[in-house]
């Protein structure tokens, strides 16, 4: 976010959002803008405040507020309020702890096998719940999985600004596969089909989880990190070919063998295929 916008947001700190929420400090950013730690000045409870400038040509926070309202479940932050304040769209939600990405970095890019197994089970449960609501996340990455609190080992899934319905709850009709040529997500973890610009479905969220686990097991390194091209399309094309031609047996040789089994299962899933719990 530009310094001019940041300065405008700093001015907003002296005001109250919705009459009672005040920004305390910036704690991160999402697919929409900045995330702040805030406080409800009435009950003194801390909250997370997401801020998106209204004139950016999109409204991801409105979309996210709709999804959060309809999700309501274990491991999903509570939507407290959403609306407009001055030049900004503002979403208030539960304040959570640090992301797996930040914890991983603080721990010198290392997680124990026990830790990875414990949070992987929760991550799969979270994405299964999201999928049960006919929703795909489309931006699976360590920064979008947070710990609830220091004394609570509960994993939360966040940031639904890029999410999409894959099936109509009214007609039960699945979206159709197509090559959109527009990539959505984070290329480092995105599925092979997503990186090549294909419409995403449940299988793509699962494949992205697999790349995230490979990242953790390999000390925070994946073969396509650092790929640089003048055009984004060229970069995505290069990453696509690197992922497509990855030798799992070689790259995952020091990881649990289940990683290879899992990745091969994800790669074989058909576009509309419902995920078999026994395989994950």
Report residues per predicted region.
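Activation segment/activation loop of eukaryotic-type protein kinase catalytic domains
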Residues: 148-184
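Structural motif in protein kinase domains
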Residues: 96-105
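ATP-binding glycine-rich loop module of kinase domains
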Residues: 40-62
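Structural motif at the C-terminus of the N-lobe alphaC helix and the adjacent alphaC-beta4 loop
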Residues: 66-74
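Activation segment signature within eukaryotic-like protein kinase domains
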Residues: 119-120
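Catalytic-loop of the protein kinase fold
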Residues: 131-149
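Short beta-strand micro-motifs within the conserved protein kinase catalytic domain, predominantly
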Residues: 78-89
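Conserved N-lobe ATP-binding subsite of Hanks-type protein kinase domains
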Residues: 34
